[in-house]
Amino acid sequence: MTKDIHQHRILILDFGSQYTQLIARRVREIGVYCELWAWDVTEEQMREFNPSGIILSGGPESVTEAGSPRAPEYVFNAGVPVFGICYGMQTMAEQLGGKVQSSTEREFGYAKVEVLGNSGKTSALLRNIEDAIADNGNALLDVWMSHGDKVTTIPADFTTIAQTATCPHAAMANEAKRFYGVQFHPEVTHTRQGARMLEHFVKDICGCECLWTPATIIDDAVARIREQVGDDEVILGLSGGVDSSVVAMLVHRAIGDRLTCVFVDNGLLRLNEGQQVMEMFGDHFGLNIVKVDAEERFLSALAGEDEPEAKRKIIGRVFVEVFDDEAKKLKNARWLAQGTIYPDVIESAASKTGKAHVIKSHHNVGGLPEEMKMGLVEPLRELFKDEVRRVGLELGLPYDMLYRHPFPGPGLGVRVLGEVKKEYCDLLRKADAVFIEELRKADLYNQVSQAFAVFLPVRSVGVMGDGRKYDWVIALRAVETIDFMTAHWAHLPYDFLGHVSNRIINEINGISRVVYDVSGKPPATIEWE
């Protein structure tokens, strides 16, 4: 009998750290299922979840301030291992009888942690982990710190297992109860041995089996889809993006031709994208796809509108209308498949303290009219984006499609600045295709996180041969980022940029000038609109 891939599970309580989702991704990478909940979870909810272990995340608040978040008391009475990270360690120490105070010496960035005494051999968390050896024989670890407060007195029955020059209790442990705390962040790559610490906690201390893999995720999703929809038919809005493509493959594997994919060509796609989607999913994979040519409908709705948020809302509204029209033709479709992923679920979860993330509006079919009365099939709702990509590879989708740069939901509608016209979209499509083609040829595409062209609705004088021309301007944008929350503009070679500019101006009639965007985020956003 196949094992339940959710059988061993870790609960991560979120105290507001920017790295909390990273903790969950690291646990998943180990091969163990986990969920991320707000810190104010009830005992009943935790009992129902029945975790094999609990991780307390970092957070921006101070344990020394009244009203700051605390872990539910049940965390320390549940009889399972607990791992406190940064703020998580501080609230653990304070709640179990230790002391925390604000420090005059804040630690931000790299630090060297010394593993004390015999802890490098006896501590289940830090056993046999080292980056270097100190003169006294103790293990040294390169870690990433981000804290102002620090633990000054550890609780009774705890021992200090690591320290820094300014932080006397950089890590603490109660080996009998399997409680551990570290003042640094093992989830970030800057902490070189962080993945091994998390693996020690999840596998060795919590005893979790590695049941969470792309292959087992697929088997589980297929079984769930079959159980959920029975003999009914399913409809899916297929965009050709990563999420909807993986959903299409999963649902098709589960129910075959009872899935109908609706591909809406809104006239705001990249060059030849509609043709590529139809060839890949229709011809190659044999999915049942209905293609709707709705370019005129979208462009008519956008005519005269130049405000970015209004354009986004128009594109979202018209998509819903077009999709609704097609769905009504499929009389037997009882279910709607969507590409909701786990970060969407997290961001939409409201904490009773009001400290959860804000709900995002997505440009998918989530806003379909209530009268459609369809059930939702969301096979990716437990997965992070990197997991979706790995599942896609396992399903046979091409690497280049799964790992291509992000493309906004409204498409070229927010890369044509101001009013959107067919002429502008056609010029932008061609310029963008040249830029991406040259990035790939120069082996630069995978060295930047996102690259694209932007159409600027301004004319500029140019010289072609013996004549002058007065044509449009294209901006090129390329950024390097880890999380898309902040980004640096990519320092592409001057010769490369010159070559791309020459190709765009010489090969695309209607463009007279190319500029390169050297703005970081912040203060600028990655997209121009």
UniProtKB/Swiss-Prot annotation:
One MF annotation (Gene Ontology) recorded for this entry: ATP binding
Q: Can you state which reaction this protein catalyses?
A: XMP + L-glutamine + ATP + H2O = GMP + L-glutamate + AMP + diphosphate + 2 H(+)
Its UniProt pathway annotation is: Purine metabolism; GMP biosynthesis; GMP from XMP (L-Gln route): step 1/1
Q: What is this protein called?
A: GMP synthase [glutamine-hydrolyzing]
The subunit field of the Swiss-Prot or TrEMBL record says: Homodimer.
Q: Which species is listed as the source?
A: Aeromonas hydrophila subsp. hydrophila (strain ATCC 7966 / DSM 30187 / BCRC 13018 / CCUG 14551 / JCM 1027 / KCTC 2358 / NCIMB 9240 / NCTC 8049)
Residues binding ATP: S239, G240, G241, V242, D243, S244, S245
User: Membrane spanning segments where?
Assistant: none
Domain named Glutamine amidotransferase type-1: which ranges?
A: 9-211
Where would I find the GMPS ATP-PPase domain in this sequence?
Answer: 212-404
The UniProt record lists the keyword Transport: no
One Pfam assignment: GATase
Q: What Enzyme Commission number(s) appear in the record?
A: 6.3.5.2
Active site (catalytic residues): C86, H185, E187
The gene designation is: guaA
Q: Name one GO cellular component term.
A: cytosol
